[in-house]
């Protein structure tokens, strides 16, 4: 029998050369794919990298600018009012709400369960991209309707049923990028709500077609305010980027919350 060449390495051994705690086999493979594509990968699901956990959060204690309370005998008030100048401001028991996640990215069961949970916690939830699920609206005591770049599923009559309008500009997981819903998640029901063919990838643009700058955005905020007859707060949702500059510009557009 011919002798095996000990110096010859198989493909699997070659692919893992140079790996370490940072450059794992998955990371190296991802780099190879991106170099072949010439762009970032388009895929579903969450980020591959590790992100901070709830246990990593630290609440800033009170000193001079915030009056200190005696935690063992005084109650810390968490109630939050959004849009106090509106006819129907949103009143939360906690300063946290369930952010926008679309029907499609999440299942019907997940959306309705989050709606029930938000109501139990005295908080709010949001429609996300793609329009309204009637049962989500029914189970949500406080509910935001989202105005998004693609306009998929946007219905002004549904917006008038909301407790607040959220204008989507960015989100933490992918700041400055549009949406991408994998084809296997575009079921017949999702496709019908968004007026799209089922089973194909759905892309949303990174920019809104209704404005090019802060002046246009201010007009959009006013348009939504007139749509809802100034009954509910108009909220701008930003992904954290140039926070100081972005928040200053957003504030000039006169929303009820950012």
What is each residue range found by the language model?
Residues 1-96, 100, 105-119, 123-124, ...:
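Conserved, well-structured core domains of diverse proteins
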Residues 116, 152-258:
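Alpha/beta enzyme core
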Residues 145-153:
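Active-site loop/lid in soluble adenylation, ligation, and acyl-transfer enzymes
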